[in-house]
Structure formats: C-alpha cells, structure tokens
Amino acid sequence: MTDKLRKYVLPNIPYVFIGWVFLKLGTAYRLAAGGDFAHKFIGLGQTVSAAFADFAPGLAPFDWLVGIVGAVAFRLLIYFKSKNAKKYRRDAEYGSARWGNEKDIKPFVDPKFENNMLLTATERLTMNTRPKNPANARNLNFCGIGSSGSGKTRFWLTPQLLQAHSSYVVVDPKGGVLGQVGAFLQKRGYKIKVFNSIDFSKSMHYNPLAYIKTEADILKFVNALISNTKGEGKEGDPFWTKAETLLYCALLGYIIFEGAEEDRNMNTLVDMISGMEVKEDDEDFLNAVDYMFKGLEQRKPNCFAVKQYKKYKLSSGKTAKSILISCGARLAPFDIPQLREIMSYDELELDRMGDRRTATFFCISDTDSTYNFLVALAFSQMFNLLCERADNVHGGRLPHHVRVLWDEAANTGQVPNLEKLVAVIRSREISLCLLYQQLAQCKAIYDKNAETILGNMDSVLFLGGREASTIKEISENWLGKATISMQTEGRSRGQSESYSQNTQRLGRELMTPSELATMPGDRCILQLRGLPPFYSKKYDLKQHPNYRFTAEADKVKNAFDLDRLIDRRRRPGMNEECEVYEVSVPDEALTDEDEDILNYDDLDDPDAFV
C-alpha cells in the first residue's frame, strides 16, 4: 500500500491545488457582470479578490466543472511536454565519473570493526554477504594489483589476518607473514597449518592422494597435476599428454582402490612408473606392473583402473617407452628425498578448513619456483573439497567463512576451472583474494578466462605501478570520464585591441595514465562494484587495534615458533627405530597443541578413522 501511495497519490497532490485555483477562477467568472463571455472576462478583475477571499470551494456545479477541467488540462499539458522534452544531463555531457565518498561506502560497512574486510584506510566491506537490503550485497572476492614494493603484503594482506574473523589460507612468500601474525592467531584459538616448500624440515605433510575418493577425483587431480607441471614454452603434441593421462588414471585407480592405506601416496605412483620396464623388440614382455593389472583384471575386469590401463597398453613398445620417459620427467621433483617424505602422509586437512577456525600457510620461495606447483595442486583440491563438504555436510554453507589470500598468484601455477569456481564459491562461504603485480600476469596464466575471473571480483584495489597496459585499463575502464569546464582567453592587438573569453565543456579521465604512474606511495584506488572509485590512503598496519600482538611490535613476545609447532607433530619414519614408553598424563596437563595433534575434533566424524 505504501508503494502505491508513493507512486500514484503523492505525485498528483499538487494538481489538487491547481484544481482549486481553477475552481476559484470559475467562481470569479460566474460572479462577474455581463451576459456574454467578453463582458464577463472584462469583469473578472472586480470579482477575483472576492472569489479567493473564501477558501471553501462552494457547491456551484459550474465552479467545480471549471476546476476539474482546468486541473485535468494542466496535467495533460505537463504529461505531453515531459514526453517530448529534450534529454539534458547538465554537467555530465561527456561523463559523470567522480570520486566516491563516505556516504557512498557507508551502507556496505558493518558497525563492528572486526566484522569487516579492510580495503583502504577509510573504506571497509562487511563480511555479511546476505545483508538486510539485497542491493547492498557484494561478494568478498578481491583482486589487488601493485608493483613490487607497493605494499600488497603490509598494507592489505597482513591487516586481513589481524581481523581474525574467518578461516584463512595464505600464500606466504618467504614465510614472513606467518612469523608476523602466527602467534597472534594461535592465541585467538586458530589451528595453525604450515606447508613450507622453502624448508621441508619445517613443514607439515601433504598427501594429495588422501583426498581422492572417487574416479572423478582422480581425473580432477590428474588434470591439475598436468596443468602445473607442463613447464614453459609452447605445448607439444597433445597425444603425449593424453597418453600420460591414461597411465596416471590407471595407476592412481590401482593405488587408491586396491593398494594398502600406507601406500596411497605420490611415492607409490613414482615407484610404479620407475618399475615399468618396456622392451621395444619384445611386445609380449610383461613387467611387474603388468602382472599387477593382469591379476586385477581377473578379479575386477570392469573396474576403472583396468579399463584405463588396457587403453594405455594399446601403444607399441617404442611409444610406451616414450610415454614413460615423459611421465618420469614430469614427476622428477617427486624423486627428491625431502619431497618424498613430506608427501608420505597428510596433515593439512584441506577439507576441514571451514569446520573450525584454521589458518593454513603455504610458505613459498620468491626466488625458486621449483616446488610452487604444489600450491596450485593443493588449491585445486581444496576448492572442490570445501564446496563438496559445504553441500554434503553443512547444508550448503560452511560454519566458518574461508578466505584464500593468494599473494604472488602469478608465481604459483594454475588452478584448473578457476573461472568456474570463483563464480560459485561465494554461496559456500568461501572467498578468493588474488594479488598480482600487474593485470597482464593473470591474463598470461588464464588467457581468455582471466576476464571472467576478474569479473567475479567485486572489489579491485590498485596500490601503484607503472606497467602501461595496467594503468591504461584502470584509467579508461575503471575510472571513466568526468565533464569539466574549460575556459579559453584570447587577445588581439592592432589598431583596436580586443579581448575575448570563452567557456566550453569537455570530457577528461578522473586520472590519466601518467597521473596513475606518479600516484603517491601512500595512496591507492579502490573500485567496488556499483560504486564510484575511491581515491584513498592505504591502510596503515600500525593503526590496527591488534598491531600490538604482531612480531613487528614485540619480536620477543609475539614471534611465532615454527620449529616448536613442527617438532611436536613429527611422526617417526617407516624405518626409524623408536622406543615407546607408556605414561599417564592428567587431562589438565594437555595443551591446545596436544589436542590438535590428537585430533579430538575429528572424533564425531565417522569417516575420520576409516
């Protein structure tokens, strides 16, 4: 009813007054002396004041007829003039771009500081993706662009972790962020997980095969493995990649569904390929793996592994040897002893990050990218695992929002189908934050899909840089043009001096590429979907309420002890001799870290000990 009142009644109230005016003019005409129109019209001047002296409209039918006809005629006049009116946009002839202000961002900010995603020093975005007003709903996907030294880690990534409102997955070049905030998160009750490709002796274990449950999982894993180990340069004949895929699927199918639990890891896959001897001159030669699959075929002739292996065996001896060489080259990193040990079992629990507050750090080298593909491999599994767990266990939404803070996203490989995942993870309480040095890096990895990925980022932040294509994209497509006034002056001298001054309108970018390239180091530009861009100061880490808990504020008190975390969780090696002592420990003596090691939180999961 309120909407109808606002739409139909309120706009027509002024015409009631117009009708009253015409009614009074009708009264004046009726009271005027004379018998015809001309004499009555001349006599209006003497009766107008008397007609308007009384506010009451009276009951004379003639007066009401004049009032109604006059009001309707006036309304029709306004209607037709508005339909035929020329369209003018004053001060917006060439564009209406402007900088955003406090009023623009206010509806998107949560009153509680800790319930926001920090964007700049003055702009924040609520973590609530389902606000009361649907028009204010924004996804939490984010893209940050800034050249080296522009403050992507210090001014944006680290403050996000100090908010401590979600589960976090952090790609941490050099491991500096973990040392900065690890102790703070631990004190806040977070379960800390670390995969350290810089120093495997200070890393938890990651076994990608621990998350493979179905044949579809095998295909997803193989695609991710091949995508991130294809090396640089132009891709060769796709035949060899497809042949490798057949062999990987067959071997993984055997390992997952037929192998012992302790053998379900990448080491077994590498060992099986190493043991697949092929003789070019003897097509009937059978190696150890051939005999394994021959026995499996007798037991389960229609199983997935057998079908894939039979297709692989269609190749000749020479072709099979080339396939094995290609597989061996691709899996060469998994022959390194440190990596074999780190992938022997799993501690990361990638599928449980949304079940409780967890902070998982992937520490990578910023100078050597040998092992960086493992991060993309883990991420490709993690997104699918979290979506499946949200749908199958938690009714579509994870209990704890999971934020993926992916620093140096260009140096850690490719996640297959990321353009599709980024569009659907929002509803499962997962958000992706990508940090690049320039837009071209994203396009180099994901090609045409880069636009789809960036299009699903409601928040984009430019922290500074001078790469030409990036600043041109920002100037022309992010910021747009504003209409400005230009004043020109002219003066001519001769026999008679003349002076002229003209004002005209023209369009100008809010910031030109050259202005973006010379933007002050403490400034940034934020683009939030549906709002004008914001030209603001970067968030000062020292101004955060929890800054005092960082290692930078107090290195002695707040430094994170990674060695202690890893040593307490260490599992003896397969051939390591250990002495076991039976002791009784009172419950009050157990620490939070002991409880993490024992995984008491998994006792209610029927699949935890299968």
How would you describe each model-predicted region?
Residues 1-150, 154-157, 201, 491, ...:
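Basic- and hydrophobic-enriched, low-structure N-terminal and domain-boundary segments
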Residues 116-136, 146, 206, 383, ...:
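Generic preference for hydrophobic/aromatic residues in regular secondary structure cores
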Residues 126-131, 230-239, 261, 485-504:
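Low-complexity, polar-biased intrinsically disordered regions enriched in Pro/Ser/Thr/Gly
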Residues 509, 548-549:
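Extended alpha-helical interface modules used as scaffolds for assembling large macromolecular complexes
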Residues 47-48, 52-53, 62-116, 215-225, ...:
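Short alpha-helical interface patches
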Residues 113-119, 373-380, 474:
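Conserved long hydrophobic alpha-helices within structured protein cores
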Residues 5, 24-27, 138-430, 445, ...:
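P-loop NTPase motor domains
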